[in-house]
């Protein structure tokens, strides 16, 4: 009888959480990241993706793609973690053992589905998605197959907000025509090597002989990919060991011989390690930089923060402060950035501008959202730095008369707040003096308004 592994992937998770808790953003292109335009996109709504914007893209590029209707909001990881915890509690309740892959995706293998028909699995998956939607308000895509590899591919095919199943008997029909890059373990280097051999699809790889695999990809990795392509995947669904550290390093084909080249490499590694940190869902207290010189000497330096952070600017600034340069140590061949001291508890930075590499002057901003009857939206968000009194772009705020809201505009001594949560529908806008004593900073989690 067939086993059924289910992969659940929350759709555009960070952006969906923002649209859930800030109803005015629903249906609009939303980018999650630094409102100033520096750094990279942490999340993009499907409305933004239709313009070509995506996660890990430079923010300035994504903003140019989505145009004037786009809205950029600062990330609120406390909200994402709370939503993630609720989703995974549902998966455990309905599916049993959960293998968490990241903050927004995981596997289950419900015992009740062993030997079930595709129709029965579809009914179960529909029920799971309905429970997730009912208890969190968030969309989820579900994929199912005879192993984790196929289930993961199927959830990608199900997006957005759908279900896609592939029974073992359908493997050749549904999987073989897909690009070989869909397989786990086939990165750019392996894909290029396979293309040189004329291997473009999963089916092309599956039809290769064992000897061809051994010669072209090796007996270990090659045979593993070959078996996955053929649909053989008996890996069990089991809880993963909690990572103690996250690290990214790159070896460069040409030695780095300038300070600028080293800084660029550190920024690249910082962004990639930060992306993995977001997937993990925790914050890091220690930032490390690893350098390997042209003569193979290795030097590692680290710094420990007084708090766990998941702020990209903080990670990058700390890594740059740890840098050593070619005029000090000679040509550099490898650059890596590591994050450790991972903790669930995370502290928001009171003065994030102190951690930035490049100081910027305070400027006015206005987040480009408006009441539903407005036909044109304009975004001129240029700086998320706090004002002298401490307000920041898209910050959560509380007012005793109007409740929970978020900063939509700030400048010339005035602050504009839109008051809304998950349950209110699009909220009304109110403008106050920035020093209004009735305004106070709010816990972002309260925007979820879960009882």
UniProtKB/Swiss-Prot annotation:
Family matches, as PROSITE patterns: UMUC
The enzyme's main class, written as a single word, is transferase
Q: Which residues bind Mg(2+)?
A: 9, 104
Q: Which domain of life is it from?
A: Bacteria
Write the record's keywords in alphabetical order, separated by commas. Cytoplasm, DNA damage, DNA repair, DNA replication, DNA-binding, DNA-directed DNA polymerase, Magnesium, Metal-binding, Mutator protein, Nucleotidyltransferase, Transferase
An example Gene Ontology cellular component term from the record? cytosol
Name one process (GO BP) from the record. SOS response
NCBIfam families xref list: PRK02406.1 (NF002677), PRK03348.1 (NF002882)
HAMAP family the UniProt entry points to = DNApol_IV (MF_01113)
Q: What is this protein called?
A: DNA polymerase IV
Q: Which organism is it from?
A: Corynebacterium diphtheriae (strain ATCC 700971 / NCTC 13129 / Biotype gravis)
UniProt gene name: dinB
